[in-house]
Amino acid sequence: MKLLLIFICVWLSLATINAQSFNPKFFCFSDAFSRSEYATDPVAQAKLLKQLGFDGIEMNAGSPEQNDKKLEAVQQQNLKVFMIWAKVDLEAKEAIDARLYDLIPKLKDKGATVWVHINSKSRTPSNATGDSICISILQKLADYADDYGVRIALYPHHGDWLIKVGHAVALTQKVNRRNLGAVFNLCHYLKLEDPAQLETELTKAVPYLFSVSINGADDGETNKMEWDRLIQPLGNGSFNVLKVLKILQQNEYKGPIGLQCYALKEKPQDHLTTSMATWKKYMKKLN
């Protein structure tokens, strides 16, 4: 009898684990609108995202007036600004984007994250000689942001100094601030790293990730592909994006997921509708 009870308890525990829900918040990159009539209209952007079922948006750090308009438009639709796009320049006199000193206080306790791409004019990508200066800059930025409940995430980006998710994780460990983490960006990973190692690299990164971005893409020799094949509406292309989401689910990733939309040719209402329909299909399969 005791053995039967033990078996039932173990089975129930396994069933609970297997049935773990996976419903991350889903937000849209602001580049979804950059080549359209929506480009300078944050109100129209927010209304469309609300209509389609997105949880929020990423926005670029702008002037104080631009930031205020964007934040107000998003708030009016009961959406959230998940990410703020900004730059760190290792050699610049002002290494930290000065616009953040106006914007970060406005994000106080709103659950926002500033994701930074890190540039260097004198160092090649991933050159370790930049680590020490970068760590010092990031500690300063993270400490400032922490006073307002804002997080910082390191965004690997093709053409910058920080290009790989493993480097972002290593810097996160060295910076050692509770409000600083890393980003996994699918299109940049496919452009720069080995798709065959994606599961291994993503699994190692998950404990440090504050955000993930996805999009449709093609499979194959992705390092040789241009962006029109590496960034497509979700559901387009031959790359198995659902597998990426399964890896996140299996490793208990809890953060938001963003939709990369750079240089898409379709109208925003068209490609975003396609991507949202695919997202809902993915969530149904995973839950």
Where are these regions (language model features)?
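N-terminal pre-domain/capping segments
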Residues: 18-105, 109, 177, 181, ...
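Histidine-acidic metal/acid-base catalytic patches
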Residues: 20-30, 40-47, 139, 143, ...
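Acidic-and-aromatic substrate-binding clefts and catalytic sites of carbohydrate-active enzymes
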Residues: 33-40, 56-69, 88-98, 122-126, ...
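Residue-level detector of anion-binding/catalytic polar loops
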Residues: 55-56, 80, 113, 151, ...
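Active-site acidic/histidine proton-transfer and metal-coordination neighborhood
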Residues: 93-182
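Conserved beta-strand positions in the central sheet of alpha/beta enzyme cores
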Residues: 58, 83, 115-116, 153, ...
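Bacterial Sec-dependent N-terminal signal peptides
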Residues: 1-21
